[in-house]
Amino acid sequence: MRKIRTIEMKRLTVEEFREIEKMPLVVVLDDVRSMHNVGSVFRTADSFRVAGVVLCGITGRPPHAEIHKTALGAEDSVSWRYFSTALEAVEALRSEGYTILSIEQVEHSTKLPSFRPEHGRKYAVILGNEVKGVHQEVVDASDGCLEIPQLGTKHSMNVSVTAGIIIYEFARELVFD
């Protein structure tokens, strides 16, 4: 086997990326404090052609050196916007026709392996603060909650890891299927 060189990958330019059809998924970051997490979410969003990233509250915003370091420029290709609270973002996204799903451990959550996104529907997934998770009022305003089943002792994952799993599962169901 031979590794594929970067030049052989036929990557899109930022301009081409902006024009190409996106997966009908928006990732909302609710008071995420780590710039590393923010940058990683941008980079993963670029990898899977996510429609956009919504930054809320204390979540860092581009331009920012720490975000850029992890995003590797994906903050320039992926569409993003800012709201002062995630609840404001939820209201705006709902008015735009998005189904709102918080990624949180709650009573009666849907386990990710059981979830099947519908083709033709737009989704917004909300990931919360590294310590407190998604704000309760945002959970209350959501159409549902998804949970990633876990087997270890911590029952929590890094925000960017969670985002990667969620985004990949949406891509697997909506794009690669």
What does each model-found stretch correspond to?
Residues M1-D177:
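Post-transcriptional modification and biogenesis factors for structured RNAs
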